[in-house]
């Protein structure tokens, strides 16, 4: 008990400092085109591709160089030749409610052969809204062949914690995140999809080797559970490792190595406290529950994540670039042998970073809200 009280006192002190640090976060530093930016290990140039956006949520760079950007209101915007075009593609059946709306966008690993684009969004149902995954093909300025593949159950009137990031492993499997919709108990309940990371075939079928596929008391789509609201997910195809960042409450954001069938603890264990300052749990570790590789106190509100690959940014290879909504920067997180080493702020005060993506060209794309824009990072030797 004494150790718990000491830990809580320490955490509260850090949150108090965070309140002071956040006081100047309305001071946004928009990038100056062509200016060389220095980081600890890599210099780069920032180019602004689009401004005046409202609530950009997801980014996908096509093989032909066009950049697709989702607006939470239900539209896909197109950037071509480094400029925002007038083209807007409306996605049907999007329910804009609270934090919900049109969210992530990604292409199939064999996009150049099959043309499939995958979308996540909140959809209206009889009992409220629910996280939904669909796929479609681009046909000019509209979508065609749209197929709804999955909807997280149960639907609810709650407007929070939809999760909604989508990644592929290159073997025909799709992973995507589902938040607990603001109800803590959902995360430990295997009878629903909320507070989970889920795994399906690329056409929506349930893989026969999913961890709970033969458990009648669990949803067969579940890959891992005990999550709060994961809004950054990447799959490292070199090491066959799934990684995710998720929002904690007040403090306790996490970077996790996500493994088959494992429990990531929320809300039984957490390094955060409730927004009103009261404890959520008096323990931070428990047998049978996974520890984060990195956790943040105070919260940075992680949203969007890329893992740097290729030869364009050699000094950042395998580093994670994590969007920080609350702290308005991109966090460069360095690991060694799966353990946290260090972190650096990039693009400090650029705005609420919602999405970070590495394109097939090896360059880094970042979307922000407040102000709403998309920028591109190119290396400088």
Give residue ranges: language-model regions.
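Acidic, Gly/Ser/Thr-rich repeat motifs that build Ca2+-stabilized beta-propeller blades
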Residues: 22-183, 235, 241-248, 298-336, ...
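Bacterial signal peptide processing site
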Residues: 18-20
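Beta-propeller blade signature
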Residues: 131-141, 190-203, 258-259
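Sec-dependent N-terminal signal peptides
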Residues: 4-12
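C-terminal motif of bacterial Sec signal peptides marking the signal peptidase cleavage site
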Residues: 14-16
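Surface-exposed loop and turn segments in beta-propeller and other repeat-based domains
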Residues: 88-100, 146-162, 202-224, 266-297
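Short, conserved, GDST-rich strand-edge loop motifs in beta-rich repeat architectures
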Residues: 123, 176-194, 252-254, 258
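Conserved blade-ending motifs and adjacent loop-strand segments that build the rim/top face
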Residues: 227, 339-360
């Amino acid at each position: 008990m004494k150790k718990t009280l000491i830990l809580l006192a320490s955490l509260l002190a850090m949150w108090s400092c965070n309140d002071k640090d956040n006081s100047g976060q309305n001071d946004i530093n928009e990038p100056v085109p062509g200016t060389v930016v220095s980081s600890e290990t890599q210099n780069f140039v920032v180019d602004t591709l689009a401004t005046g956006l409202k609530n950009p949520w997801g980014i996908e760079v096509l093989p032909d160089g066009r950049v697709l950007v989702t607006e939470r209101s239900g539209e896909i915007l197109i950037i071509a030749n480094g400029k925002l075009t007038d083209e807007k593609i409306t996605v049907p059946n999007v329910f804009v409610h609270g934090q919900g709306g049109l969210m992530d966008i990604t292409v199939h690993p064999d996009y150049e052969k099959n043309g499939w684009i995958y979308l996540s969004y909140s959809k209206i149902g009889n009992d409220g809204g629910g996280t939904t995954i669909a796929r479609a093909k681009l046909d000019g300025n509209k979508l065609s062949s749209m197929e709804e593949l999955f909807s997280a159950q149960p639907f609810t009137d709650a407007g929070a914690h939809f999760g909604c990031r989508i990644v592929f492993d290159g073997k025909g499997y799709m992973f995507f995140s589902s938040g607990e919709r603001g109800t803590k108990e959902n995360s430990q309940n295997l009878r629903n999809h909320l507070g989970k990371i889920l795994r399906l075939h690329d056409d929506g079928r349930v893989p026969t080797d999913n961890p709970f596929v033969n458990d009648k008391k669990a949803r067969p789509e579940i890959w891992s559970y005990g999550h709060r609201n994961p809004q950054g997910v990447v799959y490292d195809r070199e090491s066959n490792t799934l990684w995710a960042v998720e929002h904690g409450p007040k403090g306790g954001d996490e970077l996790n190595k996500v493994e088959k069938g494992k429990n990531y603890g929320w809300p039984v264990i957490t390094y955060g406290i409730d927004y009103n300052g009261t404890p959520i749990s008096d323990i931070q570790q428990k047998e049978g529950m996974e520890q984060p590789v990195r956790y943040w106190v105070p919260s940075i509100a992680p949203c969007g994540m890329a893992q740097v690959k290729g030869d364009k940014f050699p000094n950042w290879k395998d580093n994670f670039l994590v969007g920080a909504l609350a702290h308005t920067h991109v966090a460069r997180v360095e690991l060694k042998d799966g353990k946290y080493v260090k972190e650096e702020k990039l693009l400090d005060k650029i705005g609420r970073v919602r999405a970070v993506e590495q394109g097939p060209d090896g360059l880094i794309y970042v979307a922000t809200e407040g102000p709403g824009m998309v920028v591109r990072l190119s290396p400088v030797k």
